[in-house]
C-alpha cells in the first residue's frame, strides 16, 4: 500500500509538473507561430486595403476596432502601425482607431444626456473622461456597450462614419498613440 501511494504521488505530482512544463512549451511552439501568422495576415490585408481605398479601410477599422478590442485582437495591428511610423515617418491606421475611440465617447455622451439613472450617468461620464484623457475604451466597451446591442451598433456606425472621413482625407499620425484629446498633436505631420 505504501508503494501505491508513491505511484499516485509520482503520477499526479511529477507528471502534473511535466504536463505544465511541456504544455507551456508546446503552446509557445504551436500557438505562438499561429498568432504571428494571423497578425501578419491582418497586417497584409490592412495595408492592401489602404492602398486600394482609404474610405473602405476607414469604415472597416473605424467601425470594427471596438470589435477587435473586445476580442483582444487589436494588439496584432499595433506592430504594423509602429513599423509604418519607423519606415515612412507616419501611419494611416492609427487615425482610423481614433474614430472608434471618439465614437465610444459620443455613445457614452448620448447615454449621459438621456439616462435617468444616476449610476448609469456617472458611469458614462467616467467613460467619457477616461477615454478623452487616456484613450482607454475597455471599461466603457465592456461595462456599457457590449451589454446593449443598440449602443454597440450605434458606436460601430459612428466609428465607421468617422473612419470613412479620416480615410477619405488621408489623415496620418507621426507617432504611435492611442486616440484621445491629449494625443491630437500626433496629427501634425509635414510631407505625408
Language-model features, listed with the residues they occupy:
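Signature of multi-pass transmembrane helix bundles
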Residues: 1-66, 183-192
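Transmembrane helical segments that form the transport core of multi-pass membrane transport proteins
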Residues: 42-96
Amino acid at each position: 500500500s505504501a508503494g501505491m501511494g508513491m505511484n499516485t504521488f509520482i503520477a499526479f505530482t511529477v507528471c502534473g509538473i511535466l504536463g505544465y512544463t511541456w504544455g507551456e512549451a508546446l503552446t509557445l511552439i504551436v500557438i505562438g507561430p499561429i498568432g504571428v501568422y494571423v497578425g501578419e495576415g491582418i497586417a497584409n490585408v490592412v495595408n492592401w486595403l489602404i492602398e486600394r481605398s482609404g474610405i473602405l479601410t476607414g469604415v472597416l477599422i473605424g467601425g470594427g476596432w471596438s470589435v477587435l478590442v473586445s476580442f483582444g485582437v487589436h494588439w496584432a495591428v499595433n506592430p504594423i502601425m509602429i513599423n509604418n511610423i519607423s519606415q515612412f515617418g507616419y501611419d494611416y491606421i492609427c487615425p482610423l482607431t481614433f474614430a472608434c475611440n471618439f465614437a465610444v465617447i459620443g455613445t457614452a455622451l448620448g447615454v449621459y444626456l438621456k439616462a435617468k439613472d444616476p449610476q448609469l450617468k456617472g458611469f458614462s461620464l467616467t467613460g467619457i473622461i477616461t477615454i478623452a484623457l487616456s484613450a482607454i475604451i475597455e471599461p466603457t466597451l465592456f461595462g456599457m456597450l457590449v451589454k446593449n446591442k443598440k449602443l454597440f451598433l450605434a458606436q460601430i456606425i459612428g466609428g465607421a462614419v468617422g473612419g470613412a472621413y479620416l480615410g477619405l482625407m488621408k489623415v496620418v499620425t507621426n507617432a504611435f498613440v492611442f486616440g484621445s484629446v491629449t494625443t491630437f498633436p500626433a496629427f501634425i505631420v509635414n510631407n505625408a
